[in-house]
Amino acid sequence: MEEINLRELQLKSLEMGKYFVSFCEENNLLCYLCGGGAIGSLRHSGFIPWDDDLDFFMPREDYEKLALLWNEKANTKKYSLVKANENLVDHNLFITIRDNDTTAIKPYQKGLDISHGIALDIIPLDGCPSGNYQRKFQLMWGLIYSLFCAQVLPEKHGGLKKKVSKILLSIFKSKKIRYKIWKIAEKKMTKYKVKDSEYITELCSGPYYMKKKYKKEWFIDKIYVDFEDTKMPIPIGYDGYLKTAFGDYMTLPPKEKQLPHHDLLFLDLNNGYTNYKELWK
């Protein structure tokens, strides 16, 4: 594996981000940087110095349109859209856009016949019910969706969740039954439409972030801010969103937490993943 050059990885991610944002603009799809990318745009006018990737939010309606339009209109020779379905489990809960001319093999995706290029994560935003009872059920369905869509045990979310998940996956072993449960859960958790809701939530970001809810008005539109050598979209209500999700986001974390979060078995920024089938098959 080539030595990881963080800046080169950032620039590859930026190139992908530019293409993705341009595609969304051309097809009237709303997208915005989220998480570390949004923080980086405001605090550093670019990447957080130790960060290496970009993630985007999209309202659910635009997210589903993206999945339909990509293979029809995008440069799929260069960039693949990967979305789990009945015949493909990629152990993610959301769409990823992959650069086919690179290789970035992640431990949890070894053995999968997918594009193993570096990825942009595209995360949907869904309506959040106002009632506590309905919200609890939405979160329950969100957890069921997370388990049966990703079909991996939650490593970072406590022993009880892991034990329950292991039991459920051992009971429901059939691919068809798992897919049926996953689609039922997805339908139940997404039944609250963004346009009809006062708040929105991120149900595909794992147990911690799915508990967050944000004012819909924060995401009704985007604004463009400086990001490296370009402009990138962030939510119009970025301050409310980032404070709710991360607290005092403009303050640097302690030095010991300023670390890249590489989780890769193999990385090559100059050669496509098809050159390394023996490593990921």
Model-found features: residue ranges?
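A short secondary-structure junction signal
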Residues: 132-137
